[in-house]
């Protein structure tokens, strides 16, 4: 049984295969070509955290592939009334062909996958966000070619998105420069996944210099609202500005997994500027996940 809980659940060759297939599926969709290999298949979607892009991309993706997506929330299921995750996994996975879970604790994903008869996909956890990384890697490849031996600058919180970038650097062989204030950096065991490809910087400009891609995320994620003021103070100097993009160079792309807070982690002029590919990046969630659904349900 194959699951997709982290990028490391796929080999390097499989990641490249998924990226190629994602671009093929995007091109087919834009050309109006009907491709429905998942007729009769059902994706169960468990949302403990609300979402726009994750829900729309998985629901639309299943519909475009000929299947159906079933939305489940703790409020509407026995999960919200204390049923053990293991029991829910045993039951739901016998009725659907795959399960996507967007949750807070990564351990919930692991417990569910450990008792599931169907593939489980990490739609986001507090540890990592591998589906977003597939879309980001697809977007970079489409605009700049292979990411191997390139340089990526992560500016801001060493959060789940940063963790997945660290995994990707170790797997795919590109340099990752992380600029984050003390207290908000990835733990040593996470950094170790990137090996000598990852460096941590105190200064955002030093991290961004010569980067092929500059990327960031919100300073306070869902569930961290009470920390907003403290985080705004800690992350002063870690905003992606026009001057920081100039430091990176005209070749640098800008990405953000969204939603973005203009004027906090990124200036509006950067988000809307010529180096920004965030809207392609957002669309590619749809196509990268369609490739993943094919891979897990059909084996290709």
UniProtKB/Swiss-Prot annotation:
Q: Where in the cell is it found?
A: Cytoplasm
Record GO cellular component, one term? cytoplasm
Query: Pathway, per UniProt?
Result: Amino-acid biosynthesis; L-arginine biosynthesis; L-arginine from L-ornithine and carbamoyl phosphate: step 1/3
NCBIfam families for this protein: orni_carb_tr (TIGR00658), PRK00779.1 (NF001986)
Q: Which UniProt keywords apply?
A: Amino-acid biosynthesis, Arginine biosynthesis, Cytoplasm, Transferase
Tagged with keyword Lyase: no
Give the residues the record marks as binding carbamoyl phosphate. Answer: 51-54, 78, 102, 129-132, 257-258, 285
> Would I find Cytoplasm among this entry's keywords?
yes
Gene Ontology BP, a term: citrulline biosynthetic process
Under the heading Gene3D superfamilies, the entry gives: Aspartate/ornithine carbamoyltransferase
The EC code for this enzyme is 2.1.3.3
Which species is this UniProt entry from?
Answer: Halorhodospira halophila (strain DSM 244 / SL1)
Source organism superkingdom: Bacteria
Q: Which Pfam families match?
A: OTCace, OTCace_N
Please state what class of enzyme this protein is: transferase
UniProt similarity note:
Belongs to the aspartate/ornithine carbamoyltransferase superfamily. OTCase family.
Q: Which reaction does it catalyse?
A: carbamoyl phosphate + L-ornithine = L-citrulline + phosphate + H(+)
The Swiss-Prot or TrEMBL record annotates one GO molecular function as: ornithine carbamoyltransferase activity
This protein's name: Ornithine carbamoyltransferase
Q: What does this protein do?
A: Reversibly catalyzes the transfer of the carbamoyl group from carbamoyl phosphate (CP) to the N(epsilon) atom of ornithine (ORN) to produce L-citrulline.
**Residues that bind L-ornithine:** 160, 217, 221-222
Cited SUPFAM superfamilies: Aspartate/ornithine carbamoyltransferase
Major location (coarse): cytoplasm
């Amino acid at each position: 049984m194959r699951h997709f809980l982290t990028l490391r659940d796929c080999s390097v060759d499989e990641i490249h295969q998924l990226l190629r297939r994602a671009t093929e599926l995007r091109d087919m969709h834009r050309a109006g070509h009907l491709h429905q290999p998942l007729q009769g298949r059902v994706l169960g979607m468990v949302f403990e955290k609300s979402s726009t892009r994750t829900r729309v991309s998985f629901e639309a993706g299943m519909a475009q592939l000929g299947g159906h997506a079933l939305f489940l929330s703790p409020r509407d299921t026995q999960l919200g009334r204390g049923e053990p995750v293991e029991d829910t996994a045993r039951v739901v996975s016998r009725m659907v062909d795959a399960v996507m879970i967007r949750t807070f604790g990564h351990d919930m994903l692991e417990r569910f996958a450990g008792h599931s008869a169907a593939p489980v996909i990490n739609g986001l956890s507090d540890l990592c966000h591998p589906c977003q990384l597939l879309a980001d890697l697809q977007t970079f490849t489409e605009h700049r070619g292979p990411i191997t031996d390139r340089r990526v600058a992560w500016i801001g919180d060493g959060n789940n998105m940063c963790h997945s970038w660290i995994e990707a650097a170790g797997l795919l062989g590109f340099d990752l420069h992380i600029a984050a204030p003390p207290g908000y950096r990835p733990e040593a065991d996470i950094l170790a996944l990137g090996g000598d490809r990852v460096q941590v910087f105190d200064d955002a400009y030093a991290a961004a210099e010569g980067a092929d891609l500059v990327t960031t995320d919100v300073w306070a994620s869902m569930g961290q609202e009470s920390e907003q003021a403290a985080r705004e103070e800690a992350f002063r100097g870690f905003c992606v500005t026009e001057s920081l993009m100039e430091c990176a160079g005209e070749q640098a792309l800008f990405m953000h997994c969204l939603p973005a807070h203009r004027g906090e982690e990124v200036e509006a002029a950067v988000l809307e500027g010529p180096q920004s590919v965030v809207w392609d990046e957002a669309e590619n969630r749809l196509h990268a996940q369609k490739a993943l659904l094919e891979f897990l349900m059909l084996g290709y």
